[in-house]
A protein has these predicted regions:
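Gly/Gly-Pro- and Ser/Thr-rich, intrinsically disordered tail segments characteristic of DNA damage-repair
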Residues: 4-119
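Phosphate/anion-contacting hairpin/loop surfaces
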Residues: 70-72, 76-172, 176-177
Length: 177
């Protein structure tokens, strides 16, 4: 079982868990496990089925959103919302499943249903997600962030508001307040 009310560090833990669980495996199916997900994400799941079998190449996260490359220009993405988690057990509020050719099953459970799944283009990924602002995954250009902080502190903003700017500090959440 993985973390409730996930912020950036917890999302990174989830990605590490998925990468360990699915390493060297071939994804054989993506499927819904609940009627709400069938209704809300039926088209996403239908599209994902076009990419199987899929050699698992590893999830990565940018801030609180996680991604799996499914072809040269497309990514499967998920967001945990407030209560989302992945585990090897199907539970009451399980909505989505990834299965591998060796019968490994990983379930997405989200009691409050604030999480989501999507297919994102490479262009959308590059436009909407700022990779360099993710301290958990990339070499952080410290000088660039120091300059940003100094420039914004001059405007007399609260430090917390500056740190919550997801463009520069991906995955930092309200736990700072």
């Amino acid at each position: 079982n993985i973390i409730k009310m996930p912020e950036g560090p917890e999302v990174k833990i989830v990605v590490d868990y998925l990468n360990k669980s699915l390493k060297n495996k071939k994804i054989s199916s993506f499927s819904h496990c609940s009627k709400p997900y069938k209704i809300k994400y039926g088209e996403v799941i239908k599209s994902l089925k076009e990419y199987v079998p899929l050699d698992f190449t590893g999830f990565f996260c940018i801030g609180k959103t996680s991604f799996l490359k499914i072809d040269k220009r497309k990514y499967f993405s998920f967001h945990l919302g407030m209560t989302g988690k992945w585990s090897e057990k199907k539970e009451k509020h399980t909505h989505f499943k990834i299965e591998t050719s060796d019968n490994t099953k990983i379930y997405f459970t989200d009691p409050r249903r604030f999480g989501n799944i999507k297919i994102v283009s490479k262009d959308q990924l590059d436009k909407d997600y700022y990779k360099e602002g993710d301290f958990l995954n990339y070499n952080t250009p410290i000088k660039k962030y120091a300059e940003y902080l100094v420039n914004n502190l001059k405007s007399e903003q609260e430090v917390c508001k500056i740190l919550l700017n997801q463009k520069y500090f991906s995955g930092v959440g309200n736990y700072l307040k």
